[in-house]
């Protein structure tokens, strides 16, 4: 299979870099890459949102704030590159064609953000579409898709399997400005729907056994066209 992994920045760097988890995810990705083609997109997470929030004190320019977030995603991506050692391409990849070329070298391309207005979820969905990936795996700090925000509604119900259309409907409720933090943002959900991309959305616990998760052993949400 050809698989794109979308790893949330808050998963890798909750308050500070989670070195143990980064080592675990690097091991899992290395193991998976032995039998599958792998590409990775890394998000900015809480750190990016804090910088973007601080920048609001100085500028209303959303594009400028997006660039701040992009730089932080790439710093997080470099951490994962370091953990993957020789298995990863040694530089952060910034375009899809380069990601494809790196995969032909049997290396794992690691991307961060690319363009203002696109979250890393959207980048991952577009990369999956470009590469004609068999599966997009979204690793977030929530263990799947819920019918409402589980942080605000204790009775929120997790959805084990949904359509891409339903994902778009749920994602439309999330924040679309720089630093938005929905499980999957609306633009990414629309790209997933357009590309008819089979998508698995899982939390940090499932990510620790990522090799099993891609085989169906997970507690997350499977999104299908």
UniProtKB/Swiss-Prot annotation:
CDD domains: AAK_UMPK-PyrH-Pf. It is an enzyme of class 2 (transferase). Its EC number is 2.7.4.22. One of its GO terms (molecular function) is ATP binding. It is found in: Cytoplasm. One of its GO terms (biological process) is 'de novo' CTP biosynthetic process. One of its GO terms (cellular component) is cytoplasm. Inhibited by UTP. ATP binds at residues 9-10, 45, 49, 140-141, 146, 149. Gene3D superfamilies: Acetylglutamate kinase-like. UMP binds at residues 44, 66, 114-120. Keywords: ATP-binding, Cytoplasm, Kinase, Nucleotide-binding, Pyrimidine biosynthesis, Transferase. Pathway: Pyrimidine metabolism; CTP biosynthesis via de novo pathway; UDP from UMP (UMPK route): step 1/1. Pfam families: AA_kinase. It catalyses: UMP + ATP = UDP + ADP. Catalyzes the reversible phosphorylation of UMP to UDP. Belongs to the UMP kinase family. Homohexamer. This is Uridylate kinase. The lineage of its organism: Archaea, Methanobacteriati, Methanobacteriota, Thermococci, Thermococcales. The gene is pyrH.
């Amino acid at each position: 299979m050809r698989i794109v992994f979308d790893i949330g920045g808050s998963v890798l760097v909750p308050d500070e870099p989670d070195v143990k988890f980064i080592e675990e995810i690097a091991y899992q990705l290395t193991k998976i890459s032995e039998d599958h083609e792998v590409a990775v997109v890394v998000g900015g997470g809480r750190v990016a949102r804090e910088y973007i929030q601080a920048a609001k004190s100085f500028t209303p320019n959303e594009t400028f704030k997006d660039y701040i977030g992009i730089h932080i995603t790439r710093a997080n991506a470099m951490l994962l590159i370091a953990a993957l050692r020789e298995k990863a391409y040694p530089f952060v990849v910034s375009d899809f064609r380069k990601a494809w070329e790196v995969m032909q070298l049997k290396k794992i391309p690691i991307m961060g953000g690319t363009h203002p207005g696109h979250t890393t979820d959207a980048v991952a969905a577009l990369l999956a579409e470009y590469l004609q990936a068999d599966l997009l795996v979204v690793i977030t700090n929530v263990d799947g898709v819920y019918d409402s925000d589980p942080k605000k509604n204790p009775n929120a119900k997790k959805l084990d399997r949904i359509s891409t259309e339903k994902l778009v409907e749920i994602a439309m409720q999330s924040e679309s400005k720089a630093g938005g933090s929905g499980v999957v943002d609306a633009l990414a959900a629309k790209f997933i729907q357009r590309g008819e991309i089979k998508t698995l959305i899982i939390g940090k616990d499932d990510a620790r056994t990522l090799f099993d998760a891609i085989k169906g052993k997970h507690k997350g949400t499977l999104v299908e066209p």
